């Protein structure tokens, strides 16, 4: 089973990307959030992969820029009525920490923003994810009712972490330096500023 691919971005389509690994091209199905964060064609990337078998389609590779996203995808698919397409749709509108926060505050409306996810399915997702692992990230930082100040918007943090991982930096280290940069720069920090500050902290 394929768990990760490191290679060059050969093509990027509307629903998938072609990753060239030592001359072998892998078609990887991705959500729009992931596709928009991929490096330019010809540049190297690391894709975390989940293999899904379908009777009609055979094996399909689903790709994510972080282990956290792949873990959330796998967890979402344990819910009745949530297939790969719906799981990707949810992760397109809610990064794992945002999804965990929505579940914590029982915000089914946030989940229902996903394409193809109606109110009933959104309610089921919120209920069934209560006791399941979704994110390793600091969920409280993105909780609407958190008592601690929000250090950074999750979209900016996610983009910055993904960019650092694309440079070969391990996810835990990338998260640590991005969170540190966010605390210094404030909650309005944008991805480029976070990335620059994080790289400076790493001495690059």
UniProtKB/Swiss-Prot annotation:
Domain I: annotated segments: 1-65
GO BP terms, alphabetized: DNA recombination; DNA repair
Region of interest (Domain III), residue spans: 155-204
Matches recorded under InterPro entries: DNA_helicase_Holl-junc_RuvA_I (IPR013849), NA-bd_OB-fold (IPR012340), RuvA (IPR000085), RuvA_2-like (IPR010994), RuvA_C (IPR011114), RuvA_C_sf (IPR036267)
UniProt key word DNA repair: yes
GO MF term list: ATP binding; four-way junction DNA binding; four-way junction helicase activity
Keywords, comma-separated and alphabetical: Cytoplasm, DNA damage, DNA recombination, DNA repair, DNA-binding
Region (Flexible linker): 145-155
Assembly and binders: Homotetramer. Forms an RuvA(8)-RuvB(12)-Holliday junction (HJ) complex. HJ DNA is sandwiched between 2 RuvA tetramers; dsDNA enters through RuvA and exits via RuvB. An RuvB hexamer assembles on each DNA strand where it exits the tetramer. Each RuvB hexamer is contacted by two RuvA subunits (via domain III) on 2 adjacent RuvB subunits; this complex drives branch migration. In the full resolvosome a probable DNA-RuvA(4)-RuvB(12)-RuvC(2) complex forms which resolves the HJ.
Function: The RuvA-RuvB-RuvC complex processes Holliday junction (HJ) DNA during genetic recombination and DNA repair, while the RuvA-RuvB complex plays an important role in the rescue of blocked DNA replication forks via replication fork reversal (RFR). RuvA specifically binds to HJ cruciform DNA, conferring on it an open structure. The RuvB hexamer acts as an ATP-dependent pump, pulling dsDNA into and through the RuvAB complex. HJ branch migration allows RuvC to scan DNA until it finds its consensus sequence, where it cleaves and resolves the cruciform DNA.
Family recorded in the similarity comment: Belongs to the RuvA family.
Protein's recorded name: Holliday junction branch migration complex subunit RuvA
Underlying gene: ruvA
